[in-house]
A protein has these predicted regions:
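Alpha-helical transmembrane segments of multi-pass membrane proteins
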Residues: 146, 158-184, 363
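Interhelical loop/hinge segments that connect adjacent transmembrane helices in multipass membrane
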Residues: 7-54, 228-286, 294
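Transmembrane helical elements of multi-pass membrane transporters/channels
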Residues: 52-71, 170, 204, 234-246, ...
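Small-residue-rich hydrophobic transmembrane alpha-helices
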Residues: 76, 83-138, 181-190, 307-363
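Signature of the first transmembrane helix
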Residues: 22-35, 48-108, 276-298
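Short runs within selected transmembrane alpha-helices of multi-pass transporters and secretion channels
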Residues: 104-108, 170-190, 197-205, 231-247
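Helix-loop interface residues and adjacent transmembrane-helix termini in multi-pass membrane transporters
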Residues: 77-80, 190-191, 218, 225, ...
Length: 363
């Protein structure tokens, strides 16, 4: 739909068909949107092609899901009653998802719009997003630390509540790492660079697994007795290191080479208009989910543990391909939406016109 002109050797010229169906191009230049050429054509493995981007995104999402399963196994070896405590990390990130579904989801109609803005301006929006998300994530982390007792009373069973306070306070700063990671990941996907989110996930999971094997696994080095708080510290360290590494990799390989715009208040306002809609939707959706979770937790530790295991399986088996398809599709729809908005035709568009054609004119 929005192929990379450098990678594919073609120039996107005429975009969607006019409302009256007159394309103005010869039939051999026509590229039907319902054709699979945009997904499996030349260089299908490339990150600027839908199939290639989908593979990158699938790998990026599946690695954290795999690690979440391993964590539960290792914690069960330490103390099976504390497996439910590891779900605190999930619930903190669920609350953080509210801010991660705000401005970061606005990238698909702003940063992904290749027609309305230059690459320099799109990079400036990405920088504004990253700065604002980092500030919001830091604020949310401080709130979690201050309200650790109240958080435990809502999302941790009574039997292990006292033993989970430190775990909550350590895991609180995962809201900051999550905010940075999501901002970088969404912005780079909108810029047709899904390899950067994959780099972040690969680095995070690889270091996490290596340190967990060395420190908290059943065959760890040393003579100490590992506990759940050590695991929380390892996970937080790796999350922060991966998020910051991905940020600096993006800045040094893309932003500095392109002399991109600096973060601005105007960039924040551009993102705020579409982002406020997704923010409200996410707040309502996640509030209902957390209300359901608190009800399950209040029933018993067994129910809470079972719910956590079910959620881990669900995110691993079902939601990974769904998230990968969503992120990839939103990127390419954002590109096409930018093309669509540049059409000079003011009348209302019919459904047939919206399912129009794209034209590729060889160089």
């Amino acid at each position: 739909m929005a192929p990379n002109t450098q990678a594919n050797g073609s120039q996107v010229s005429a975009h969607l068909a006019t409302p009256d169906g007159d394309s103005g191009n010869s039939s051999h230049d026509r590229f039907d949107l319902f054709s699979l050429r945009w997904a499996a054509g030349d260089r299908w493995w490339h990150r600027s092609n839908y199939t290639g981007a989908f593979l990158f995104n699938t790998a990026a999402f599946i690695l954290p899901a795999l690690y979440s399963t391993l964590v539960k196994i290792w914690i069960a070896k330490i103390d099976s009653s504390l497996v439910v405590t590891t779900d605190v990390y999930t619930y903190i990130n669920t609350i953080a998802e509210v801010i991660n579904d705000g401005l970061p989801r606005a990238v698909w109609v702003t940063i992904a719009d290749t027609e309305a803005r230059s690459l320099k301006a799109r990079l400036g929006l990405a920088h504004s997003l990253m700065v604002f998300q980092a500030l919001l994530g830091l604020l949310m982390s401080v709130i979690f630390v201050a309200a650790a007792q109240q958080f435990a009373s809502a999302f941790v069973p009574r039997d292990v509540r006292a033993a989970s306070i430190t775990y909550i306070r350590v895991s609180a700063f995962s809201a900051l790492s999550s905010a940075i990671e999501v901002a970088v990941s969404n912005a780079t996907r909108a810029l047709d660079k899904p390899d950067i989110p994959l780099l972040i996930s690969s680095f995070k999971v690889a270091i996490n697994i290596a340190l967990d094997l060395l420190i908290i696994s059943t065959f760890h080095v040393g003579n100490w007795n590992p506990d759940i708080n050590i695991q929380a510290g390892i996970r937080l360290t790796c999350d922060m290191a991966a998020a910051i590494s991905g940020l600096f990799y993006f800045l040094f390989t893309v932003s500095f080479r392109r002399s991109a715009d600096a973060p601005t208040l105007q960039g924040f306002i551009v993102l705020l208009k579409p982002g406020s809609i997704t923010f409200i939707e996410s707040a309502l959706r996640n509030a209902l989910y957390l209300w359901l979770v608190s009800g399950v937790v209040s029933m018993s530790a067994d129910y809470a543990t079972a719910w956590g295991v079910f959620s881990t399986i669900r995110w691993g088996l079902i939601m990974v391909p769904v998230q990968a398809a969503e992120a990839t599709t939103l990127t390419f729809v954002g590109h096409a939406w930018g093309l669509f908005k540049q059409r000079p035709y003011p009348p209302r568009w019919s459904w047939a016109s919206l399912c129009g054609t794209i034209y590729l004119r060889p160089r």
